[in-house]
Structure formats: structure tokens, C-alpha cells
Amino acid sequence: MSGASARSLGKGSAPPGPVPEGQIRVYSMRFCPFAQRTLMVLKAKGIRHEIININLKNKPEWFFEKNPFGLVPVLENTQGHLITESVITCEYLDEAYPEKKLFPDDPYEKACQKMTFELFSKVPSLVTSFIRAKRKEDHPGIKEELKKEFSKLEEAMANKRTAFFGGNSLSMIDYLIWPWFQRLEALELNECIDHTPKLKLWMATMQEDPVASSHFIDAKTYRDYLSLYLQDSPEACDYGL
């Protein structure tokens, strides 16, 4: 089965056939923020695509031929070419399908987006540390670190004086960082942005974007998924289906 809401393929499953003509395939997982980056770029650019969900707690043997690390997202085109790593997949899509560019053409503006992305670079690992922290006493320290990182982004937004990180319209940088902001409420980390009014305004604007909002997962569903995932349950990736 394929599609955003299709059940995931696990150990013992048959590998999918060739990628349909005129499409590109993405190997994904419904709750993965890294895969969400790629899915949002596909949707924002209007690229016809096929979604194959992978059970990351019960990975199919054949999937390691697509990515030796066994991680999503992975892109596969009709030539059988494979592209891994979320940021690389997004940049590939922007160049391979140039009709609606998400990165700016101007080299300096593109460099500015990449520099802003570096300001965000510690956030995913800090969020993962928070999720995996076995002792509640460790949470305040991680939250303080997150507040520092969000302060850097608040300053960048203040200096930019635009609605989005790349200007007055949505662009690649906004999609690359959005999945982690979207999960703050579910993770009960909203307090980490209490001191960043411009970031909060940006988040409210992002929630109105049809591409960003199409990947909305309600807080309870996400928390229930996480509970199963942290128990290494093979049912985690298909939770709610």
C-alpha cells in the first residue's frame, strides 16, 4: 500500500516495484519530522509523488538497500537513483523540479537561508534528548538550552523584519525548521518560546499555510505514538490507523 495514511511496510514485506512514470517515490514514516521536510517540499512544489511508509521499529530487509542506515526520508526516481538525508532530498527536489523554486536564486540570499539553518541546527538533537531523557530532573536543563537556541532565531527574525525567515513569502528555510516547532505543544515545550514574540507570530502564520497545516498531528496522537515508539513497539509507526 502507498499513500500518506497507508500502513507501513515491515520485516518480511515485499519490496515495491519500479517507481511509476511521471512520479518520484518517497520512503517515509507518518510521525517523522525529518521525512515531513521532504513531504512538505513535494507538496509545496506540486510534484507528483508516491509515499511508501516504513516501519522504523520493524524495518524491511530490502529497505537497507535503499539506505544502508535504515533511515527515512529516501527519494527514489524513475531511473532508480536514491537520495537520502532530509536536507539533501529537499535541495535535490528544488533543483530537479525548478518550476517553483523554494530556495532563492540569488547566491547571497540562499547563503543567508543556510546560515539561518545553522542557527537552528542544535534544536532537533535537543528535542530528541528531551524526549529520551529518562529522568525528569534533566528536563529543565534541556529546556534552558532550547530557549537559548530559540533566542538566536528570534534575533534573526528581528533583524530580517519580514513575516518569514527568507522574506515576505514562505521559502525553503521555513519548511526545513517547521516540523520541530509544530511538535512543541505535543511535547509540552511551548514555554521555551514564551520569550520570543516574533517566533510565536511566525508559528501562527505557518499554521495558516495549507502545506504546513496539512501535516498537522494532534497532541494526544503524537504523545501516544511517542509512548509506543520509546517502548520499541512495532505498532508505533501505524498508531491511529
Curated annotation (Swiss-Prot):
Modified residues (N-acetylserine): 2
Primary subcellular site in the record, as a coarse category: cytoplasm
Residues found modified as N6-acetyllysine: 57, 143, 148, 152
Gene Ontology BP term (one): glutathione metabolic process
Cellular component, GO annotation: axon; basement membrane; cell body; cytoplasm; cytosol; nuclear membrane
Enzyme nomenclature, EC number: 2.5.1.18, 1.8.5.1, 1.20.4.2
Active-site residue list: 32 (nucleophile)
Gene Ontology molecular function terms on file: glutathione dehydrogenase (ascorbate) activity; glutathione transferase activity; methylarsonate reductase activity; oxidoreductase activity
Record-linked Pfam families: GST_C, GST_N_2
Protein origin, superkingdom: Eukaryota
Matching InterPro entries: Glutathione-S-Trfase_C-like, Glutathione-S-Trfase_C_sf, Glutathione_S-Trfase_N, GST_C, GST_omega, GST_Omega/HSP26, Omega/Tau-like, Thioredoxin-like_sf
Record-annotated GST N-terminal domain positions: 22-101
Subunit structure: Homodimer.
Protein's name according to its UniProt entry: Glutathione S-transferase omega-1
Source organism (scientific name): Rattus norvegicus (Rat)
Gene name tied to this protein: Gsto1
